């Protein structure tokens, strides 16, 4: 591999760190903002140079279309991470939240799963998400009405069906014993951590 300039090395480290912490590469705009570029175009030129040197692969047509070649990926842990207790203010995929890795092909889910979450409680039992199940989650930051999401409300992580009306979000259970969680975005914090894309029943397949 051809040697990197200091700026290229800085961008490559930023990409690796972002993937490790959030499960996703940064956008061009995020790279530009974090490293002080005047525009996303400046970041794009550095990304093209990194691609020519074989450090990254660029997938056209998507703002996060950056991936590390296989030899650049950290293979010390493989498979899907099972996320345990999530610390306040920390990314859900931060390494300290990972309890263990399961050898499950992420592509068996659609969209591809990025992590697993153990289900607590029976609030989603009517759609087959039960206590103790492993929920496969695709990492996203936005959701559409009707989707089942993993959401963080004031640092509590919950699995619910998403509905947004104006500046208010309702997180609906799939169990008549539970009332919706109402989140007024004007003064409450809500983070979408991902979409539910599959369920592994109480450790089946593992």
From Swiss-Prot:
Q: Annotated DNA-binding ranges?
A: 28-48
Alphabetized UniProt keyword annotations: Autocatalytic cleavage, DNA damage, DNA repair, DNA replication, DNA-binding, Hydrolase, Repressor, SOS response, Transcription, Transcription regulation
User: What cellular component GO annotations does this protein have?
Assistant: protein-DNA complex
The answer on whether this UniProt entry bears the keyword Cell inner membrane reads no
What InterPro entries does its record include? LexA, LexA-like, LexA/Signal_pep-like_sf, LexA_DNA-bd_dom, LexA_repressor, Peptidase_S24_LexA, Peptidase_S24_S26A/B/C, WH-like_DNA-bd_sf
Catalytic positions are 123, 160
Q: Which GO terms describe its biological process?
A: DNA repair; DNA replication; negative regulation of DNA-templated transcription; proteolysis; SOS response
> In chain numbering, where does the site feature Cleavage fall?
88-89
State the top-level EC class. Answer: hydrolase
Family membership, please give it. Answer: Belongs to the peptidase S24 family.
What PANTHER family does the record tag this protein with?
LEXA REPRESSOR, LEXA REPRESSOR-RELATED
Any idea what this protein is called? LexA repressor
UniProt source species: Shewanella oneidensis (strain ATCC 700550 / JCM 31522 / CIP 106686 / LMG 19005 / NCIMB 14063 / MR-1)
């Amino acid at each position: 591999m051809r040697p990197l300039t200091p700026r290229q090395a800085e961008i490559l480290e930023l990409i690796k760190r972002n993937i490790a912490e959030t499960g996703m590469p940064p956008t061009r705009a995020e790279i530009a903002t974090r490293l002080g570029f005047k525009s996303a175009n400046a970041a794009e030129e550095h990304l093209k140079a990194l691609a020519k040197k074989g450090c990254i692969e660029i997938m056209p047509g998507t703002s996060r279309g950056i991936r590390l070649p296989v030899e650049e990926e950290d293979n010390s842990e493989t498979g899907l991470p099972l996320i345990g207790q999530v610390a306040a203010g920390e990314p859900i995929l931060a390494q300290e939240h990972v309890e263990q890795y399961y050898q499950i092909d992420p592509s068996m889910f659609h969209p591809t799963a990025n992590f697993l979450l153990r289900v607590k409680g029976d609030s989603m039992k009517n759609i087959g998400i039960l206590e103790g199940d492993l929920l496969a989650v695709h990492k996203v930051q936005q959701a559409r009405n009707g989707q089942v999401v993993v959401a963080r409300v004031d640092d509590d992580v919950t699995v619910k069906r998403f509905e947004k009306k104006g500046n208010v979000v309702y997180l609906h259970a799939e169990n008549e014993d539970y009332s919706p969680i109402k989140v007024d975005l004007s003064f409450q914090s809500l983070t979408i951590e991902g979409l539910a894309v599959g369920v592994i029943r109480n450790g089946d397949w593992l």
